[in-house]
A protein has these predicted regions:
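Right-hand nucleic-acid polymerase module
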Residues: 1-52, 62-207
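Cys/His-coordinated zinc-finger cores
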Residues: 58
Length: 207
């Protein structure tokens, strides 16, 4: 994450974050272990601070050796340092990275789906629990639409690009981060994706 910003600063902050993320993925120690990634944007609003908190949720697929080789593994502190470097920050940002673990009864697939749902949850300004005035709602929607203008909300990298090609995931990239209460509620069907490790080619392939 980065520090909170005003509505006027949101668009530039999002540009900086996406550029910083691209730099992070190209760092040698990150790139050599990376099989694929899913990057999603989330922006939350603080009424108390009257500011926005732009941040990324990222799902990384790494090589099997990542957790076994000391030279390859990147701990929490090092991820924080790499993100600070990529963003060119003069303060220590907050980075929370965790291994996806299988939940009892759900399996690894369930753990991945559980992790992946957070990046794409919408920010609902019409929720009565938010207690926003009508003027505040209008301002928040305007700030969010302006701040996220021409910003890709979800990005796929490496193996996940192949997954996107083989399955109809274009609607994810065109999703809405701001809910105004006018959308009808519906259900979505899930897809099971199997990536097989090829030892000869040292890479994953979608089956």
């Amino acid at each position: 994450t980065v520090k909170n910003v005003t509505g006027q600063e949101l668009n530039q902050s999002m540009t900086d974050i996406l550029r910083g993320f691209n730099r992070l993925m190209k760092y040698k120690k990150v790139d050599k272990n990376l099989i694929g990634f899913l990057r999603a944007t989330e922006v939350t609003y603080s009424k108390e601070l009257d500011s926005y908190h732009p941040h990324l949720h990222v799902l990384l697929m790494v090589r099997p050796s990542y957790f076994q080789a000391k030279a390859d593994y990147i701990n929490q502190e090092e991820w924080t340092e790499l993100w600070q470097k990529a963003m060119k920050l003069d303060y220590t940002p907050m980075v929370d990275i965790r291994a996806v673990k299988a939940d009892k009864g759900k399996g690894l697939k369930g753990a991945i789906l559980e992790t992946a749902k957070y990046p794409v949850k919408p920010f609902d300004v019409t929720d009565k629990k938010t207690d926003f005035t009508d003027q505040e709602k209008l301002q928040i929607v305007d700030d969010m639409l302006t701040g996220l203008h021409r910003k890709r909300q979800i990005g796929f990298g490496k193996l996940f690009k192949e997954i996107k090609k083989q399955f109809d995931f274009d609607d994810l990239e065109d999703g809405n981060l701001v809910q105004t209460g006018e959308d009808t509620e519906g259900t979505s069907s899930g897809r099971e994706i199997v990536a097989v490790w090829n030892w000869d080619r040292k890479n994953y392939f979608v089956r």
